Amino acid sequence: MPHQQMLILFGLLPVATNISTWWNFGSMLLACSSMQVLTGFFLAVHYTANINLAFSSIVHITRDVPYGWMMQNLHAIGASMFFICIYIHIARGLYYGSYLNKKTWLSGTTLLIMLMATAXXXXXXXXXXXXXXXXXXXXXXXXXXXXXXXXXXXXXXXXXXXXXXXXXXXXXXXXILPFGIISLSSLHIMLLHEDGSSNPLGTNSDIDKIPFHPYHTYKDLLMLSLMVLTLLMTVSFLPDIFNDPDNFSKANPLVTPQHIKPEWYFLFAYGILRSVPNKLGGALALAMSIMILLTTPFTHTSTIRSMTFRPIMQLMFWTLVATFVVITWAATKPVEPPFTMISQVASTMYFLFFITNPITGLVENKIMKYN
């Protein structure tokens, strides 16, 4: 019977005994994804993709639709949770050398790009003051790319300005991309289970494995319940913590908000974009900031997989984390003397981590050889 085979497949899946809590974020991402699709469905049912009605339809959802306020807040804060989990998930992969599962890592990076595309499209759907400016900026950045891009932008967003067609296109994109994410996630999991997970020691764990159920199911459930608790507490008590005051006024193409800044989870990429004075160069740096993750499996030169036993690499990694935080912070600030310099230095350091990655590995190999 197929369902029994499935139960055996997942229940008796052999997993290393020593994987830590950093390995729980994958299942949390799956839960986030499911929740976003469900809440998004209920929001889309009541949403109107028209430039004149979009903002009013969202006000209608939060005020008149039963539990609409809850759907909207769960969807918005759920997206923040999604990004917190995915950034931790990626940091875990970098730290413990999980990127050496090449197929899994490449499919995961593609997933990240799709997730960012979905989140960006959802921002434009609200047609609030910050959203119109963000959509215009995104269209302008895309148009900067090449000669052909202007036509591509017109095809995707229907017009250069954020008109009714653009809202409809964004709503449709935000509706279909999550299904792509779900399909790719299943591929990601299948590719992962070809080789199995890594572990904190970065060693082969074939000699010491336990069944996924009940051990890791309950372990996953613990972190999942903590995440749900955090989510519900935030939705209940601080629903606008990640929100921008500009989102409470309707989009007006004639009035630009004082500080156009995206959601916190894009600030890091936005900071890198802003730190390059050239328009095309900025768009390129923005794309590269994500694409550079694809290089890690090919630039790993160390004989050791995990950073647990690589002190120099640990220093580099935590510098990278600090750099990420600094870029995120600097991107919230206006474009003025101290902040521009901070952004540029931090962005350079971000890219330097990936560039010096192979050299650090070779240096560590040499040091180990002499000891």
Swiss-Prot record:
<feature type="binding site" description="axial binding residue">
    <location>
        <position position="89"/>
    </location>
    <ligand>
        <name>heme b b566</name>
    </ligand>
</feature>
<keyword id="KW-0408">Iron</keyword>
<keyword id="KW-0812">Transmembrane</keyword>
<keyword id="KW-0249">Electron transport</keyword>
<keyword id="KW-1133">Transmembrane helix</keyword>
<feature type="transmembrane region" description="Helical">
    <location>
        <begin position="25"/>
        <end position="45"/>
    </location>
</feature>
<dbReference type="GO" id="GO:0005743">
    <property type="term" value="C:mitochondrial inner membrane"/>
</dbReference>
<feature type="binding site" description="axial binding residue">
    <location>
        <position position="188"/>
    </location>
    <ligand>
        <name>heme b b566</name>
    </ligand>
</feature>
<comment type="function">
    <text>Component of the ubiquinol-cytochrome c reductase complex (complex III or cytochrome b-c1 complex) that is part of the mitochondrial respiratory chain. The b-c1 complex mediates electron transfer from ubiquinol to cytochrome c. Contributes to the generation of a proton gradient across the mitochondrial membrane that is then used for ATP synthesis.</text>
</comment>
<feature type="binding site" description="axial binding residue">
    <location>
        <position position="174"/>
    </location>
    <ligand>
        <name>heme b b562</name>
    </ligand>
</feature>
<keyword id="KW-0999">Mitochondrion inner membrane</keyword>
<keyword id="KW-0496">Mitochondrion</keyword>
<keyword id="KW-0813">Transport</keyword>
<keyword id="KW-0472">Membrane</keyword>
<feature type="transmembrane region" description="Helical">
    <location>
        <begin position="69"/>
        <end position="90"/>
    </location>
</feature>
<dbReference type="InterPro" id="IPR005798">
    <property type="entry name" value="Cyt_b/b6_C"/>
</dbReference>
<dbReference type="InterPro" id="IPR005797">
    <property type="entry name" value="Cyt_b/b6_N"/>
</dbReference>
<feature type="transmembrane region" description="Helical">
    <location>
        <begin position="339"/>
        <end position="358"/>
    </location>
</feature>
<dbReference type="InterPro" id="IPR016174">
    <property type="entry name" value="Di-haem_cyt_TM"/>
</dbReference>
<keyword id="KW-0479">Metal-binding</keyword>
<dbReference type="InterPro" id="IPR036150">
    <property type="entry name" value="Cyt_b/b6_C_sf"/>
</dbReference>
<comment type="subunit">
    <text>The cytochrome bc1 complex contains 3 respiratory subunits (MT-CYB, CYC1 and UQCRFS1), 2 core proteins (UQCRC1 and UQCRC2) and probably 6 low-molecular weight proteins.</text>
</comment>
<keyword id="KW-0349">Heme</keyword>
<comment type="similarity">
    <text>Belongs to the cytochrome b family.</text>
</comment>
<dbReference type="InterPro" id="IPR027387">
    <property type="entry name" value="Cytb/b6-like_sf"/>
</dbReference>
<feature type="binding site" description="axial binding residue">
    <location>
        <position position="75"/>
    </location>
    <ligand>
        <name>heme b b562</name>
    </ligand>
</feature>
<dbReference type="InterPro" id="IPR048260">
    <property type="entry name" value="Cytochrome_b_C_euk/bac"/>
</dbReference>
<dbReference type="Pfam" id="PF00033">
    <property type="entry name" value="Cytochrome_B"/>
</dbReference>
<feature type="transmembrane region" description="Helical">
    <location>
        <begin position="170"/>
        <end position="190"/>
    </location>
</feature>
<feature type="transmembrane region" description="Helical">
    <location>
        <begin position="218"/>
        <end position="238"/>
    </location>
</feature>
<dbReference type="Pfam" id="PF00032">
    <property type="entry name" value="Cytochrom_B_C"/>
</dbReference>
<dbReference type="GO" id="GO:0008121">
    <property type="term" value="F:ubiquinol-cytochrome-c reductase activity"/>
</dbReference>
<dbReference type="GO" id="GO:0046872">
    <property type="term" value="F:metal ion binding"/>
</dbReference>
<dbReference type="GO" id="GO:0006122">
    <property type="term" value="P:mitochondrial electron transport, ubiquinol to cytochrome c"/>
</dbReference>
<feature type="transmembrane region" description="Helical">
    <location>
        <begin position="280"/>
        <end position="300"/>
    </location>
</feature>
<feature type="transmembrane region" description="Helical">
    <location>
        <begin position="105"/>
        <end position="125"/>
    </location>
</feature>
<protein>
    <recommendedName>
        <fullName>Cytochrome b</fullName>
    </recommendedName>
</protein>
<keyword id="KW-0679">Respiratory chain</keyword>
<feature type="binding site">
    <location>
        <position position="193"/>
    </location>
    <ligand>
        <name>a ubiquinone</name>
    </ligand>
</feature>
<dbReference type="Pfam" id="PF13631">
    <property type="entry name" value="Cytochrom_B_N_2"/>
</dbReference>
<keyword id="KW-0830">Ubiquinone</keyword>
<feature type="transmembrane region" description="Helical">
    <location>
        <begin position="312"/>
        <end position="332"/>
    </location>
</feature>
